Amino acid sequence: MKTDAIELGVAKDSTPIGGANRGVSILDFILRLVALVGTLASAILMGTTNETLPFATQFIRFRAEYDDLPTFTFFVVANIVVSGYLLLSLPLSIVNIVRSTAKNRRIILIIFDTAMLALLTAGASAAAAIVYLAHKGNTRANWFAICQQFNSFCERISGSLIGSFVGVAVFILLILMSASALSRRN
């Protein structure tokens, strides 16, 4: 009797595929919320970053703002676009919880998740390179580190990278989970 069950692939203790996919869909929704909070916080933190040095003269003021560098502007725009996508994908994720056997919706999410992963990775990596230069400088190119003077500015731009890279990690997990759920269905 047991050999027949093994040969047919039927087991009494196995979980139904719909139940496992529902759990994946719930985790998908939670991870999307985590990524939304991280990317939105990163965009807000970077977008509101500025610092003016206290020893400004009558004619010269030393000020650092995020939009002084196009890389930081790209970082903010990339995080806002990804946050908007995550907000718009939440209803689709809820539909996947209710109807966990929806293959087409999951494929659409994988495609757009991959595009958003690429955008977010590009923005976070470019900003990380500039943050590194702000902290360390580059003596060969005569780029001096500015973080000794603009301490608060550097702390904020460094902190804004954390949420963005958390978003990158979450997108990788989302893509792997969705691909795994699709492969179990076939």
Swiss-Prot record:
Topology within the bilayer: Multi-pass membrane protein
Subcellular location: Cell membrane
Glycosylated sites: N50
GO cellular component: a single term: plasma membrane
One protein family per Pfam: CASP_dom
Keywords: Cell membrane, Cell wall biogenesis/degradation, Glycoprotein, Membrane, Transmembrane, Transmembrane helix
TM stretches of this protein: 26-46, 74-94, 107-127, 157-177
Signal peptide region: none
One GO-annotated biological process of the protein: cell wall modification
Extracellular compartment spans: 47-73, 128-156
Domain of life of the source: Eukaryota
Residue numbers on the Cytoplasmic membrane side: 1-25, 95-106, 178-186
Function: Regulates membrane-cell wall junctions and localized cell wall deposition. Required for establishment of the Casparian strip membrane domain (CSD) and the subsequent formation of Casparian strips, a cell wall modification of the root endodermis that determines an apoplastic barrier between the intraorganismal apoplasm and the extraorganismal apoplasm and prevents lateral diffusion.
Assembly with partners or alone: Homodimer and heterodimers.
NCBIfam families (alphabetical): A_tha_TIGR01569
Family classification: Belongs to the Casparian strip membrane proteins (CASP) family.
UniProt name for this protein: Casparian strip membrane protein 5
Organism the protein comes from: Ricinus communis
Organism taxonomic ancestry: Eukaryota, Viridiplantae, Streptophyta, Embryophyta, Tracheophyta
